[in-house]
Amino acid sequence: MQTRSLILGLTALALSACVRPIDDEKGDTAASAGATATQGGAVVAVPQVPASDPAMRLEVDLAARKLYVFHHGHAGDTLSVAVGTTEWPTKTGSFRISQVVWNPEWVPPEEAWAKDEKPEASGDPDNPLGQAQLVYDPPRSIHGTNEPASIGKAASHGSIRMRNEDIVRLAREVMEAGGAQRDSSFFSQVRRNRSTKQVVDLPNPVPITIR
């Protein structure tokens, strides 16, 4: 009798394990799989539909000194960049580009290297931000440059530099993907009036990963 009870108990445990595969040691629970449903008395997982890729995302490979553009998960342009030096490294992590600045003015940040620097107006040839700026982690950003020879090198104080022609094209794409579309007259104006700063906030910030 005791042997029969033991066998029945082991059988019940085995059945219990069979109907609950969604709660294993790897954490593949019902929450991660999606919803749950009951079928024939057993709890089963309903597969979750993967979230779609954002309209646009950026990745920066600091070692390769490259910026990669993705549209809806598909690879687009690969652009050369300058990154921070060993002393002033570019911060890694995941961020969101929330603002595009055309013809940015440069205000020296409150950091040791900029203590004796002076501000540079929009459009000034000595302005280190170039023609456009993508803000993701103030004061650091992706921006143009007045030193195109630095592209492909570790040369900045933490920001990511691009050639002016590249940042202008990328800024337009970021605005469109971020829900801040403008017509061609807007872009003609900001390129023509280089001494006038234009700030555009993005309703849908564009994700960027720096590694």
Which ranges hold each PLM region?
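Bacterial N-terminal signal peptides that target proteins for export
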Residues: 1-7
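Residue-level signal for mature regions of secreted extracellular proteins and peptides
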Residues: 11-12
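Exported/periplasmic cell-wall-interacting domains
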Residues: 22-23, 46, 111-211
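Cell wall/extracellular polymer interaction/catalysis modules
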Residues: 21-110, 119-133, 193-198, 206
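C-terminal motif of bacterial Sec signal peptides marking the signal peptidase cleavage site
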Residues: 15-17
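Short amphipathic alpha-helical segments with coiled-coil-like heptad repeat character
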Residues: 2, 75-76, 168-170
